[in-house]
Amino acid sequence: MKQFIVLTVVLLAIQELQGGAVLTVDEKCTCKDTLNTLSKDDLILRLITCTQRNENLEGIITAIKKDNDFLNKENDALRAQNCELTAQLAKEKKAREAAENALCECQKNSELLKQTIEQLKKELAQTKQELANCKEALANCKAENAKLLKKIEELNCTITQLQEELEQCRARERDLQCQLDECNKKLTICNNELIACRKQQEELRCEIERLNAEIKRLEAQNAACENALNTLRCETSEFLAIATQRQSKLTTIIQSAEAESTAIGASYIGFRNTHDLTCAPCGGPA
């Protein structure tokens, strides 16, 4: 009777797992041979273990899916950052090309100024030579000397002006060189950040692939547990059906035996009431 109560509790537990569905035994199910070899405690333990394992696997799969969604969002953010850095790098390249073009133009102007200065130096040397010659004939060439002095003064002013312009060009060249160095530094930093982003993106891609493989493995394991649980349900249904049938037969036999015992008792009482069972030698009832 206690075993029947325990089996009834197990049946109710299985029905609760199935959402209240009524269990039926498939006539073609071959699980009863395996189930008959299990004790009551083994059967309950096996059911509890399968149920707990199924719940644990569902929790793990849910957590892994959440991690996978988080990694996908982070990967999208890194892709957007990569696009932004690529656009910034293109702008830096254009600025660098513009600075290089300006530097080339400045170098050309500087070369022209150098040529002009060399030419002026030659003219100045020639003028000095003429001035030396004029000093020999200073008395006769005062008017010519005044003109030459004026010309020398003009040349000196021109040289001073050219030297100032040359100094300005050199200062401009230094500024452009500093700007070019700064652009190169920024370009190096951008390249390093781009390499780091690509490396991190590759690591995240590998991690996502590993998590996907883990999810597939856990899903396969969950399917195996589901199959084992279905098998156990079939075995339990078969066993409960057999136990119920045997209990019904046993109840019928007990009821028949009780009826026969009652009939025998009634017959015995009726026999004693209708027959004299007094023992002759002792005078007492037989």
Curated annotation (Swiss-Prot):
Glycans are attached at residue 156. Transmembrane segments: none annotated. Disulfide bonds: none annotated. It comes from the Eukaryota. SUPFAM superfamilies: Tropomyosin (SSF57997). Keywords: Coiled coil, Glycoprotein, Signal. Residues 61-235 are annotated as: Helical. Residues 1-19 form the signal peptide. The DNA puff II/9 proteins have a proposed intermolecular coiled coil structure with possibly intermolecular disulfide bridges formed by numerous cysteine residues in position D of the heptad repeat. This is Puff II/9-1 protein. The lineage of its organism: Eukaryota, Metazoa, Ecdysozoa, Arthropoda, Hexapoda.
